[in-house]
Amino acid sequence: MNLEELKKRQEKIRNFSIIAHIDHGKSTLADRILEKTETVSSREMQAQLLDSMDLERERGITIKLNAIELNYTAKDGETYIFHLIDTPGHVDFTYEVSRSLAACEGAILVVDAAQGIEAQTLANVYLALDNDLEIMPVINKIDLPAADPERVRTEIEDVIGLDASEAVLASAKAGIGIEEILEQIVEKVPAPTGDVTAPLKALIFDSVYDAYRGVILQVRVMDGVVKPGDKIQLMSNGKTFDVTEVGIFTPKAVGRDFLATGDVGYIAASIKTVQDTRVGDTVTLATNPAAEPLHGYKQMNPMVFAGLYPIESNKYNDLREALEKLQLNDASLQFEPETSQALGFGFRCGFLGLLHMDVIQERLEREFNIDLIMTAPSVIYKVNLTDGESMDVSNPSEFPDPTKIATIEEPYVKAQIMVPQEFVGAVMELAQRKRGDFVTMDYIDDNRVNVIYQIPLAEIVFDFFDKLKSSTRGYASFDYELSEYRPSKLVKMDILLNGDKVDALSFIVHKDFAYERGKLIVDKLKKIIPRQQFEVPIQAAIGHKIVARTDIKALRKNVLAKCYGGDVSRKRKLLEKQKAGKKRMKSIGSVEVPQEAFLSVLSMDEE
């Protein structure tokens, strides 16, 4: 293609993504658009086509990004090239969303006609506004009996400040309004601006590992052209690779001769590991590099850590291989080997957030058939020592001696909770119980309230989400972002069995709650650990101070059974003998801790 044709083609390109809260109908809308533009034959069509992972379909969420090229012949008779970039809607994957939005010029905002705006919709709209996207509101599910499009329209205008007078009323399920949406994309989404003649700049917004071709980059070309045979360079680490293939997805990968400015597609360059290709990085040509990378790239750091241990210790190597395979597709997953006296060999893993942790755990169990134990999730604490040093600690067992600690800081998040008015009291009570500080509260409409709190991340990691859902009958929606580190009165609590620390049960807790948490755990363990031949004390300790204790009584044989009547000194002798035996047993005996004990402590409910 010559320059003229490339420029003409560029004017016909429309790059857009779909933003929505979970369950507002994003994947269904994407399916309808694919059908309408006849990208996918009806034979290949299946619900949630873009969500290719089983887990995504089951949970009804989008985890990995997908980008698809469609051709659409508009009413003006011209054929346009659409690139639909699917985004995950969940808070853990916010960075992925922001990168995929950076690859677009426009976004379709899908809002449920019955439920209205939710917390995550809002978070993603702000990301889209940060990237200067043209936002087109679509009010979906208008065929529901509870639908109230007019209320939702005013909500969009009041809460987000978008003009919703031209919002399309649609039902993706019934196929209503799809054509209007496609026409709006043609009219409203600007064509990509970018210079075909400039040095290559392409934004990586996802990468997928392929066993035969190595890592395949999903890119949006901002400037320039890339074709097979070019030598590309990654700007964050300067590594170079030879391009073996470029192409587009029409869900299936289709090879092309080149990718030019405005195109969204893939580059294969026999790259060995996903670690080299960070989402948000810029690809350029090694022979004619761009002067500076695209802005907005940042290293993703895990926020939540937990130990993963195989239940059968001989599965340790399988677990390592499984984690390495998952890491090929998920550069934000980090892990390193760790050992625990109680659980044996395993890995300390870092995750972006709770959903990410859940998904990884479930994929390990489902795709690789490994049964796991997970230790209590923890966050990164900044520990300032008395000698002026400071250290980051994410594992309770690595905490320094309490006498050496000057202060401990913990991460706080800004939590935004949207909830119907009648549940505001319950939400506030929950947030206070989780050590939250109230920031502000405003009414979205007559019935819904947006409450903002600063809450320690450690409290959210625990079971905040489940508690929030149950105290609001599932009506609350919730979004959080890391805000700052603050000094807190935190202590490390150890659990001792028969005087020995059980490392896997140690956790960090706020001083004010230490006593009740300790009491809860020792009582819970007492119910679970089977009785031994000797008495076993269970203690919760902070440093050397015991804050809670309970004993598991010994099982004892009735040694007096064969003394009928008889002398009291004879009985005493037998009892003393038994007592001495128990004492000896206790000094050398060890207590087996059943698997449930760990799990029960992790699912700590304040019953």
UniProtKB/Swiss-Prot annotation:
GO terms for cellular component: plasma membrane. PROSITE patterns: G_TR_1, G_TR_2. Its EC number is 3.6.5.n1. It comes from the Bacteria. GTP binds at D23, H24, G25, K26, S27, T28, N140, K141, I142, D143. InterPro entries: EF-4, EFG_III/V, EFG_V-like, EFTu-like_2, G_TR_CS, LepA_C_sf, LepA_CTD, LepA_IV. The keyword Chloroplast does not apply. GO terms for biological process: positive regulation of translation. NCBIfam families: lepA, small_GTP. PANTHER family: TRANSLATION FACTOR GUF1 HOMOLOG, CHLOROPLASTIC, TRANSLATION FACTOR GUF1-RELATED. This is Elongation factor 4. It comes from Streptococcus pneumoniae (strain Hungary19A-6).
